[in-house]
Amino acid sequence: MLKMKQAAEHVLMLSAEKGFKDVDVVVERNDSLDIEIRDAKVEKVEQSTSLGLGVRVLDEGRTGLASTERLSQESIAHAFQNACENAKLQDPTQVEMLDAPAEIPDSSSLGLYNPELDQLNVDDLTELGLSMEDAVKAADVRVVSIPYLGVSRGSNESLLLSSRGVSYSQQSNEVA
């Protein structure tokens, strides 16, 4: 399995071999940890990861799209081939791929990622959920139970590369 940047670069290598000038690729990874609490007890813990790569090919004004959830060289080559074949099935349209701007700001300046959040584990999220439950009950004596309480931690990593020199990555995370 290739890393995200290797996978995107592999698509651009395949496009160069075929002589395509206008190709872009997006790779995205999402991780989440979700805790459900009911009546001061953990009822459910779910952890999930999703990964995907999308390819857009412009061939003589025709746009072809394809994707894969596997970052193996074979799966990426198959997705690229599908995008090329899908382009042949489309009517030509006016689409312009933009060249890379002179400067793309570093996404870290957006403040979307806090590495400390990725360290929160099941126990930390459970403690947070239970403290929220206690705080709500303490705030109003009429609250006798909370039928559903969920706490989750998620992180996202995105990468965009194009045959025109665009290279942009962004990382974000949250606790909700």
Label each PLM-derived region with a short phrase.
Residues 1-176:
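Active-site bordering "gate/hinge" segments
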